[in-house]
Amino acid sequence: RPPRSTRKESSAASDVYKRQIMHGAKMDAGAVAGVTTVQSPIALARAVMEQSPHVMLASRGAEQFAKEQGIPEVSPKYFETERRKRALESYKARKQAGIEPHVDYKFGTVGVVVLDSKGNLVAGTSTGGMTGKRWGRIGDAPVIGAGTYADNRSCAVSATGHGEYFIRHTVGRDICARMQFAGQSLQAAAEAVIMDELVVAGGDGGIVAVDASGEVSMV
């Protein structure tokens, strides 16, 4: 069940969720986007990975697959919180007043990275997206190599931030590639991408990651 506090209201009346999970052993992955009635979108993402030949399902197709997999269905109102309603109202008021709204990326995304006893690396990311986003917008969370990535040869990464920048710069994959091909440590690779490359591009955000030796990085 997704934490209710992760919900970010869109500028429309209802909202959508994005989830992804990736297993670093065989590069298996499952992702969903644009779902509004699935009680546990991360469970649906795992079902896509394990019970289908696909990597990503979206919108009604994803919700239909959830029904086929027996994943509980709920009303979109199930996810609503007063805090997020207030955040949306504040966003709209600032936009109407011609003030650039501030989006705090430290809240709203749940990320997990795992190194198991067999040496497998797994990453998962769950989010309701950016407050005030355009209806239909999909961010980095369900995009493999952007908001989520796992490879047993390097590391597992889960990210949060301004998704468009994370997609353009393939943040998750870039961190893993720097370790695999440039020989950088996890911390050095993460800092280079988040603190240097992303900042220069005008983006903002952070990551949590773990490598094959168990080193953890939060940047």
Q: Where would I find each of the regions flagged by the language model?
A:
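Internal active-site segments that recognize and position negatively charged phosphoryl groups
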Residues: 94-134
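C-terminal binding/interaction regions
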Residues: 15-19, 26-107, 173, 184-219
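Single conserved hydrophobic/aromatic residue that forms the stacking wall/gate
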Residues: 2-13, 17
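Zinc-dependent deaminase catalytic domain
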Residues: 106, 114-117, 122-123, 142, ...
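Residues in well-ordered beta-strands of folded domains
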Residues: 20-22, 113, 158-160, 208
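Short, glycine-/Ser/Thr-/acidic-enriched flexible segments
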Residues: 26, 120, 128-129, 162-164, ...
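Conserved mixed alpha/beta catalytic, RNA-binding, or beta-rich assembly cores of soluble enzyme
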Residues: 127-168, 174-179
